[in-house]
UniProtKB/Swiss-Prot annotation:
GO molecular function, one term: glycerol kinase activity
Protein name: Glycerol kinase
This protein's GO CC annotations: cytosol
Binding site for ATP: 17-19, 278, 322, 326, 423
Record-stated family: Belongs to the FGGY kinase family.
Length: 509
């Protein structure tokens, strides 16, 4: 007979752009169980990307159950739960029925570009940069909320009456986990977010960590819709949904990229990581002093512990990373599955002069060109699918180089090495390309899915399962290092070719 052990594990829900995952870690920080499930990507029009919030909630319940059953544990054995999520993705729902008024508008969606141009006016997209750390563009949540209120029949009137709630995905998940319309104990569910997610809305003042009435008024968003902002690490509420994690306390909430930084042990000023997921996201811890970028990066909050000052970060966000490989698989059908791209790309020594610029929804950091669209340059009769596959991998490495260069200028010093995570870092060829194009070591950890592990660490810290960040750092180990194997002359020549290719993507929309 199995003997249960109270509070032996920490759980994490990782609600990502393409799938939802649940993991359990033990006291050594090892993943002992994991389950995941993909959800539909909805493309109603060119440039529009949506998800079904109710499908995602169903998937969350499914993966939590699967992960628990696989190791035969009970809620009694779970010390706490952490939640991490795709950031900026926007849900608006009726607080009386729990029904979304529209699909979730995903962070990649560009339908709000015209709204953003109007708001930015003559001052341009940097108008609120000093206050929010963000540019006025289609990326943050604020313009997405405005679009829903202006375009969904009756939504604005319902919002002004106080009947609608807004949340990024963490808020939607927390609201449902704590009972939804009515908790099982009769209490209302919590309508909250954490500082990292709130910092991605274009509605929060980074210095006060509070919603800014002036920004809300400028976007015509009723503040009654907005969730309470709380620190990332601390007590939220126990799960009150009649499900497999009933009564487990929720003690950590982080946006996905901040969770990855946490999972990499990025607790010290200057620590940096790059996540190779659906997009590419480079974050550098800048300590408790807010630094506003002068080179096309965003300023954000890395995390905040209850009772402590927030820790800030610089971020370079690239919209197309792993999703470019998915496009090669699903749209062009050049590979049967994502991992197959590595072997195909290895069949040629170089890209044959081909470059793929994945500006499918414009270019994000550090260029911020919403007018750009995807292009393939350098095609000749010599080029084949192997060259295109190699160019797709190189596009990820070159885009990262752009962000690393911008971050070095903002920080006043170059990175000495780069820690990486995400599904794509299993691709050894891509990691060698990255080291070559950066000219620094690239380090991969033992567990490459640091987003889920990171928020599990945060929840463990919030519940006392882990006592200090020093304890967490000791659990993190580098598994493999790639050293640069390219001359400086070759590196800069290749980078110049990439920059010429990118210029061909401009003025297309």
């Amino acid at each position: 007979m199995r003997i249960s052990k109270a509070n032996a594990y920490v759980a994490a829900i990782d609600q990502g752009t393409t799938s939802t995952r649940c993991i359990f870690i033990d006291a050594q920080g090892k993943v002992v169980s994991s389950a995941s499930k993909e959800h539909r990507q909805i493309f109603p029009q060119q440039g529009w990307v949506e998800h079904d919030p109710e499908e995602i909630w169903d998937n969350i319940r499914s993966v939590v159950s699967q992960a628990m059953v696989s190791i035969d544990i009970t809620p009694h054995e779970v010390a706490s739960l952490g939640v991490t999520n795709q950031r900026e993705t926007t849900v608006v729902w009726d607080k009386h029925t729990g029904e979304p008024v529209y699909n979730a508008i995903v962070w990649q969606d560009t339908r709000t570009s015209d709204i953003c141009l109007e708001i930015a006016g003559e001052e341009g997209q940097e108008k609120w940069l000093d206050r929010t750390g963000l540019l006025i563009n289609s990326y943050p949540s604020g313009p997405k909320i405005k679009w829903i209120l202006d375009n969904v029949e009756g939504a604005r009137e319902r919002a002004e009456k106080g009947d609608l709630l807004f949340g990024t995905m963490d808020t939607w998940v927390l609201w449902n986990l704590t009972g939804g319309v009515r908790g099982d104990d009769g209490d209302d569910a919590i309508h909250v977010t954490d500082v990292t997610n709130a910092s991605r809305t274009l509605l929060m003042d980074l210095r006060t960590q509070q919603w800014d009435p002036e920004l809300c008024e400028a976007l015509d968003i009723p503040m009654s819709m907005l969730p309470e902002i709380r620190p990332s690490v601390g007590e939220f509420r126990s799960v009150r949904h009649r499900g497999t994690l009933a009564d487990v306390p929720i003690t950590g909430v982080l946006g996905d990229q901040q969770a990855a930084l946490f999972g990499q042990g990025g607790f010290h000023e200057g620590a940096a990581k790059n996540t190779y997921g659906t997009g590419l996201f480079l974050l550098m811890n800048t300590g408790t002093s807010l630094k506003i970028s002068e080179h096309g990066l965003l300023s954000t909050i890395a995390y905040q512990r209850e009772g402590s000052a927030p820790v800030y970060a610089l971020e370079g966000s690239v919209s197309m990373g792993g999703s470019l490989v998915q496009w090669l698989r699903d749209n062009l059908q050049l590979i049967p599955n994502a991992p197959a791209i590595e072997n195909l790309a290895r069949e040629v020594e170089d890209n044959g002069g081909v470059h793929v610029v994945p500006a499918f929804t414009g270019l994000f950091a550090p260029r911020w060109r919403p007018d750009a669209r995807g292009v393939i340059t350098g095609l000749t009769r010599f080029a084949n699918r192997k060259h295109i596959a190699r160019a797709v991998l190189e596009a990820n490495a070159f885009q990262t180089r752009e962000v690393v260069d911008a971050m070095a200028k903002d920080a006043g010093k170059a990175l000495e090495s780069l820690r990486v995570d995400g599904a794509m870092v299993e691709n050894d060829l891509l990691m060698q390309m990255q080291a070559d194009f950066l000219g620094i070591d690239v380090q991969r950890l033992e567990d490459v899915e640091t987003t889920a592990v990171g928020v599990a660490f945060a929840a463990g810290l919030g519940s006392g399962f882990f006592k200090t960040t020093d304890e967490i750092e000791k659990l993190i180990a580098v598994k493999k290092v790639w050293n640069p194997d390219m001359s400086e002359e070759e590196r800069e020549r290749r980078y110049a070719e990439w920059n010429r290719a990118v210029e061909h993507s401009y003025d297309q929309a």
